[in-house]
Amino acid sequence: SIIAKKKFVRKALKNFQINFIKKSKLVIVEGRDIGSKIMPNADLKLFFTCSVKEKAKRRLREFQAQNKNIKLKEVEKALIQRDKDDTERKISPLIKAKNAVLVDTTKLNIKQMKVKLINLVKNSIKIKYGNL
């Protein structure tokens, strides 16, 4: 977004996020640069990806549910541009953190995704704390 490109906004949000996270004993945080900038030492970092075609189909269903008339090709084009903008922007570009687990959601439905995420979290807890 236009606001996310502003350096002073990113800095203020970074400070707020870091302070919020420090006050929490256990926290799940989502965001573009959480794993690479805000919480580089997090116990578990996930980086989600999905094919453009599948993202566009999902987004189109959202638009259709809102009775918006838009074509799949238009949605694909917008998503391709958004991904390009996100990965190439100068301030906090979208990158996969070094030790983040890549999660490709292209072929997963919501239930499968939920199971996968729960298993990743359980495994991370087991590695850090053993069997609880």
Cite the ranges covered by each PLM segment:
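ATP-dependent small-molecule kinase phosphotransfer cores
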Residues: S1-L26, K53, K73-K90, V101, ...
